[in-house]
Amino acid sequence: MSQDKDLFLALYKPVHQPFERFCKARSYGQMHFKDLMQETLLIAYTKFDQLQEPDKFLYYLFGIAIRVLSNQRKKIQYAALSEINMTTSITQPAADTRAETEELYKALAILPIEQRESLILFEIVGFSVKEIATLQQKTEEAIRQQLSRGRKKLLVILSSKKESKDAAYE
């Protein structure tokens, strides 16, 4: 058991930062990112013996995190809660940066799931198109289209919010 723990920690340490960024961006508006990380890591550790390819540990964590979020969404829908807590702690030094990050995460939350995940993995986590295609089991061209469409929709969403703010100040 101690050997499993050591191996798990050895695999987790180098992927902690990208995993945390993924959870922050992906969990926005659904649950607190630290809760997502903890639940994902608990599941990953208890089912660690099922990991067949240790070099794909980060993908393994992403898959679990996505399923945890899906289950969370189903619980919320089943319980018929009318509102989801949209407060997520974002650790950025400047207030302007925090506000911009908050706006970006709100806009990302509006995008369709596939476009949102592709953008998060590519722009925030730093994955290549090829890695995302492998993770999502799609062609690289399909991922490029998701990224392109997602960026366009994100631009429209953020532009319309900026225009509405500018109009409010006039």
Each model region followed by its residue ranges:
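A short, charge-rich alpha-helical start-of-domain segment used by transcription regulators
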Residues: M1-R21, A25
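Sigma70-family region 2
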Residues: S2, L41-K56, K75-I76
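C-terminal edge and immediately downstream basic/flexible tail or linker adjoining helix-turn-helix-like DNA-binding
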Residues: S2-F8, T134-L135, R151-E170
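Structural recognition of an alpha-helix C-terminal capping motif at a helix-to-coil junction
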Residues: D35-L42, D55-R67
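Arg/Lys-rich amphipathic alpha helix in sigma70-family domain 2
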Residues: Q52, G63-E83, T97
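Acidic, proline/glycine-rich intrinsically disordered inter-domain spacer in sigma factors
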Residues: N85-A109, E141
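Helix-turn-helix DNA-binding module
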Residues: A109, I113, V125-A142, V156
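A short pre-motif secondary-structure segment
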Residues: S118-F122
